[in-house]
Amino acid sequence: MQWETDLIKDIRTHSAYDDKDTSGDSGIRHPNEHLWPWDEVTDANRNAIKERFLKVRDNCKAILEIGVCRNEKDSITHIFLDNKLPDTVYIGIDIDDKSFLNDPEKNIYTIQGDSSSITEAVEIFKDLGVTEFGFIFIDGWHSINQVLIDWEYTSMLSPTGIVGLHDVSSHPGPHYFINNINEEKWNVEKNVCPFDHGVGFAWRK
């Protein structure tokens, strides 16, 4: 699997812990938990994601978002939809129906299903003419096992593409993944928003 070449070690515990999603299950103490509560998606998150996306926008042929539009108008999804070029294809994968976002004339598509179904998703990508992504954002189920699976999509990351992970502060999957990426192969920003749920980024060297 892709993570086996991109991580410095296996982050799995080979226990039920590997399927835990929430920060409360993780045992990771958020360094700023005394500031709780904060919004699920903060202005700092949105600004950081927009800033990184704009760096690659002009060469970004397609965007993949795992976990779609769960915060209505404040959702990260709208950063991509509002700022992508007209010819850039947006594909969002979510376990729930997000088809209200679909707009083929604007190259906006969603897939209802489990992001673990990679083979099926890739076939849909091919049908849409997508062979690589200039930006991949992972914000689905936050367990260790699921993030390892979702990382498989980075095999389709363009040479100049960026991967973003939300909830890296204390959710187990994103937290342990971003902190164990092989920095000989990847440039890594482990957490640019440490005062909330956090967001991290990686791009190939």
What feature does the model see in each segment?
Residues 1-137, 141-205:
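A short alpha-helical cap/connector motif
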